């Protein structure tokens, strides 16, 4: 991985990676193991102190000028799974041709050659300060704060489905100006078994049941859910009859696009060379 990533060309420079994990069973153990292997092989590691959303891991890679990163997660898949997401220096997941290049290099290495411990001074624990920097960065992408402030009392129910969105999502919503945020207490408990849902995919209607039930009791306007690593959101809103309606991913994306384009146009920020990529 070091060779394929171009890390070997950075002689004299400190090579670093960011390592995170979500709520999956044994996620912390796996993340610490990943960090120890990197450190043992001479790579500096920024290891999150506890579970964090995938987008924050991506942000940290760029913010800390790291050469790559790893998040231990199985995203929205069933509880039996865990996984290893690899990231490039730009904070995005590794794509072609680098993905195959990394595998080719991995296949050249035997387990006996892999250093598993040592150099643990190269592991630096990160946490709260990155949360603050991440929230500040999120605020910079706000297009029109006045629009939000006019809706600051929007009644919102949020659930992380036992996952990594537990703290950061409500914090970000409040930092943007929303004042009426409620959470589903049973699903704020970090648990890799996801005991309150059949599957932790927020796009499955069943996973939204507890959120909608609380929303009904509180007469909420919106229910928002994030998946275990908080890189996927589902939204439920009320239709013109006051009934809950689940907005699918495509619909959500189109609403985002409509809002962004119209507000950028209104604020004079839309240029002729702007375009959307699907």
Residue locations for each model-derived region?
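Phosphate/pyrophosphate-binding loops at sites that engage ATP/ADP/AMP, CoA/4′-phosphopantetheine
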Residues: 2-11, 138-149, 264-269
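Active-site catalytic microenvironments for nucleophilic, acid-base chemistry
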Residues: 3, 63, 175, 259-264
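N-terminal small/polar loop signature for handling phosphorylated ligands or for N-terminal nucleophile
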Residues: 7-81, 179-235
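Short, surface-exposed connector motifs at secondary-structure boundaries
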Residues: 12-17, 39-44, 147-155, 219, ...
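A glycine- and small-aliphatic-rich helix-loop capping segment at beta-alpha/alpha-beta transitions
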Residues: 33-41, 64, 85-93, 171-179, ...
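Proline/glycine-rich low-complexity loops and linkers
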Residues: 49, 109-130, 239-278
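Glycine-rich phosphate-binding loop of actin/hexokinase-like ATP-binding domains
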Residues: 70, 75, 82-103, 233-262
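Gly/Ser/Thr-enriched, mixed-charge loops and adjacent short helices
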Residues: 82-209, 214
């Amino acid at each position: 991985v070091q060779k394929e990533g171009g890390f070997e060309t950075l002689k004299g420079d400190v090579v670093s990676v960011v390592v995170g994990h979500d709520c999956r069973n044994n996620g912390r153990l796996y993340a610490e193991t990943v960090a120890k292997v990197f450190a043992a092989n001479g790579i500096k590691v920024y290891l999150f102190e506890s579970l964090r959303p995938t987008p924050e891991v991506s942000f940290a890679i760029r913010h800390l000028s790291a050469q790559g990163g790893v998040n231990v997660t199985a995203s929205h898949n069933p509880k039996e799974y865990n996984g290893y997401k690899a990231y490039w220096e730009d904070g995005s997941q590794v794509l072609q041709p680098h993905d195959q290049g990394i595998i080719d290099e991995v296949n050249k290495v035997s387990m006996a050659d892999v250093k598993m411990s040592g150099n643990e001074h190269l592991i630096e624990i990160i946490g709260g300060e990155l949360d603050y920097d991440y929230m500040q960065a999120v605020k910079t992408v706000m297009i029109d704060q006045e629009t939000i402030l006019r809706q600051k009392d929007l009644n919102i129910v949020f659930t992380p489905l036992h996952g990594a969105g537990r703290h950061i999502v409500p914090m970000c919503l409040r930092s943007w100006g929303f004042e009426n945020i409620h959470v589903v207490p049973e699903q704020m408990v970090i648990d890799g078994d996801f005991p309150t849902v059949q599957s932790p995919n927020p796009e499955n209607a069943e996973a939204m049941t507890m959120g909608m039930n609380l929303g009904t009791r509180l007469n909420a306007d919106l229910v928002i859910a994030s998946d275990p690593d908080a890189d996927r959101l589902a939204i439920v809103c009320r239709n013109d009859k006051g009934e809950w309606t689940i907005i699918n991913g495509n619909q959500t994306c189109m609403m985002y696009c409509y809002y962004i384009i119209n507000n950028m146009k209104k604020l004079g920020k839309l240029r002729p060379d702007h375009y959307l990529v699907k």
